[in-house]
A protein has these predicted regions:
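Conserved GNAT acetyl-CoA-binding A-motif
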Residues: 95, 102-114
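Conserved N-terminal entry element of GNAT/NAT acetyltransferase domains
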Residues: 1-10, 143-151
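Conserved active-site alpha-helix within GNAT-family acetyltransferase domains
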Residues: 92, 116-134, 139
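Acetyl-CoA-dependent GNAT
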Residues: 9-71, 77, 97, 140-141
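Conserved acetyl-CoA-binding loop-helix of GNAT-fold acetyltransferases
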Residues: 87-100, 127
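Residues at alpha-helix boundaries and the short loops/turns that link adjacent helices
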Residues: 21-25, 88, 131
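Alpha-helical interaction/dimerization surfaces of two-component signaling modules
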Residues: 18-22, 101, 124, 128
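A short, internal acetyl-CoA/4′-phosphopantetheine-binding micro-motif in the GNAT/acyltransferase core
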Residues: 79-86
């Protein structure tokens, strides 16, 4: 039976493996710390799905208050189901749990950024009722090599 629960720092190795499936580089050296930070943050939720003790999926949610509209929104930050466990309803279960959490927090919408190459994920989100929205623009704040900021 597939169940969901809040993640714990002990889930770090399995979550790191799932993030690798999303083409994120090795997260093993910091993932446990990041999980603990997210779990302590009041506007974050980290859910996992498991079956017979094996962690098969992860869903990271961020609740964002809004200024100009009454309802807040929930952003799916990371969402992955183990590639060998897909099409078993795990993603649908996690997304449904996430939606229930968002509604309980007063959110009136959910959003997800999904890379253009993830066509299977796009089909999943469309089936769950998501629609495309306006383009997002991003600015990297990573070190760009400018010497002026270094001490």
């Amino acid at each position: 039976m597939i169940t969901t629960r809040a993640a714990t720092p002990a889930d770090a190795p399995a979550i790191s493996a799932l993030l690798t499936e999303l083409d994120y580089p090795d997260t093993s050296h910091f993932i446990e710390r990041r999980i603990a930070e997210l779990l302590a943050h009041p506007d974050e939720r980290l859910l996992v799905a498991e079956e017979d003790g094996a962690l098969l999926g992860v869903l990271s949610l961020h609740f964002i208050p809004q200024l100009a509209v009454e309802g807040d929104f929930c952003r799916i930050s990371y969402f992955c189901v183990n590639s060998r466990a897909r099409s078993k309803g795990i993603g649908r279960l996690l997304e449904s749990e996430g939606e229930a959490l968002a509604r309980s927090r007063g959110c009136d919408r959910m959003e997800v950024h999904c890379h253009s190459r993830r066509s299977d994920a796009h089909r999943f989100y469309y089936r769950q009722g998501y629609t495309e929205s306006p383009k997002y623009l991003c600015k990297s704040l990573a070190d760009d090599g400018r010497e002026g900021d270094k001490q």
